[in-house]
Every structure is written in structure tokens, then in C-alpha cells.
């Protein structure tokens, strides 16, 4: 996702507790991270989601950022107010990327927190193998209107194998 929207020198706003694949993408494309430090629940000792005022402050201090990445939910199941973050980012011309590695289930129930795509995110990465009952390594990349799907395909072709597993594709 990051390689699809960021180029060398572009800024992207993201939580400090992103997956290492996001950091690796920053290294590959040369984008500059603008970190939002999520609060930690003192009782449980776990990171919470990104607070909207913190994202707003990061946008105010970095109006040239091109995107905001949100963990939805976090590894611990905490969801940020992704609707508000999408609205805020889009109002400033920024794309929203939803890392939904642990959010497969959000697409399958009305009484669950809102999914990234339902909230209007531009891209969402879903790891079907983590909470969707699929084989390890299987995932889905969802692309919304306003994102050049052909360019996303080009980026995917640069970074994934030419010998895909037919078990995972099925």
C-alpha cells in the first residue's frame, strides 16, 4: 500500500506501532515517516489506537504529507475512529491506508467496528490467514475509487513472486 502512494521524500503519517512491513516499505520507497504515538492502557499495558486529535496535530504540522496509515484494529483488537481519520485526511488531500491484518472479521458483521473500506479508506490490506481461517500468507488488498488500480498492480508485480501458490490463490 505504501509503495502505491508514496515516493522518495513523501511524508506519511502512521502510528509508532506499525508492522515491520510498513517500515520496510518506507525504506524501499524513501518515504519519511511522521509518527503518531498511540497511548498505552496503563492497566493492560497495551497500545491503543490513534487518537483523532493526535492525527489532526500531525496533519497540521505536516500538511505536505500524502497519506495516513491506520491499524484497524491493532494487534490487540483496538480500533481507532477510522471514519473521523478518513474524513480529516481526505479534507487535506491525503490518502488513507488501513492495515487490517487483524480485521478480517470487520467485513462480516453489522455489530462490529467499521472496516476501513466502509469508512472510506483508499486502500486496505487484510490478512486472511490471521483471522479469516485461510492458509498462511494469504491476504487481500482492497482498492477504493480514486486509487489507480493499474499502478497498484505494477507495484505488486515488483514486490511479489512470479510463482504464486495456487493453494493461496484458490
Q: Where are the regions that the model predicts?
A:
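Conserved PLP-enzyme active-site core in the AAT-like
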Residues: 1-170
Amino acid at each position: 500500500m505504501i509503495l502505491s502512494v508514496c515516493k522518495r521524500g513523501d511524508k506519511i503519517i502512521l502510528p509508532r506501532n506499525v508492522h515491520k512491513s510498513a517500515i520496510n516499505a518506507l525504506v524501499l520507497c524513501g518515504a519519511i515517516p511522521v509518527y503518531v504515538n498511540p497511548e498505552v492502557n496503563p492497566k493492560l499495558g497495551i497500545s491503543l489506537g490513534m487518537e483523532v486529535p493526535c492525527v489532526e496535530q500531525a496533519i497540521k504540522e505536516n500538511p505536505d504529507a500524502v497519506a495516513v496509515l491506520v491499524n484497524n484494529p491493532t494487534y490487540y483488537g483496538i480500533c481507532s475512529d477510522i471514519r473521523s481519520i478518513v474524513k480529516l485526511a481526505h479534507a487535506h488531500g491525503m490518502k488513507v491506508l488501513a492495515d487490517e491484518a487483524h480485521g478480517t472479521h470487520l467485513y462480516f458483521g453489522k455489530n462490529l467496528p467499521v472496516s476501513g473500506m466502509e469508512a472510506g479508506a483508499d486502500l486496505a490490506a487484510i490478512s486472511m490467514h490471521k483471522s479469516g481461517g485461510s492458509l498462511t500468507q494469504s491476504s487481500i488488498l482492497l482498492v477504493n475509487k480514486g486509487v489507480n488500480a493499474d499502478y497498484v498492480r505494477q507495484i505488486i508485480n515488483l514486490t511479489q513472486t512470479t510463482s504464486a501458490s495456487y493453494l493461496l490463490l484458490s
